[in-house]
Amino acid sequence: GLFDIVKKIAGHIVSSI
């Protein structure tokens, strides 16, 4: 769902840090 996409993006940001 949409929330899954948000979580995926958030996880990508965390990984980028």
Curated annotation (Swiss-Prot):
GO BP, one example?
Answer: defense response to bacterium
Locations listed in the record: Secreted
Give expression by tissue.
Expressed by the skin dorsal glands.
Positions of post-translational Isoleucine amide modification: I17
* GO cellular component terms, semicolon-separated: extracellular region
Where along the sequence do coiled-coil regions lie? none
Q: Which InterPro entries match?
A: Aurein_antimicrobial_peptide
Q: Name one Pfam family in it.
A: Antimicrobial20
Alphabetically sorted, this entry's keywords are: Amidation, Amphibian defense peptide, Antibiotic, Antimicrobial, Secreted
Describe the function of this protein.
Answer: Antimicrobial activity against L.lactis, M.luteus, P.multocida, S.aureus, S.epidermidis and S.uberis. Probably acts by disturbing membrane functions with its amphipathic structure. Shows anticancer activity.
UniProt similarity note: Belongs to the frog skin active peptide (FSAP) family. Aurein subfamily.
Q: What is this protein called?
A: Aurein-3.3
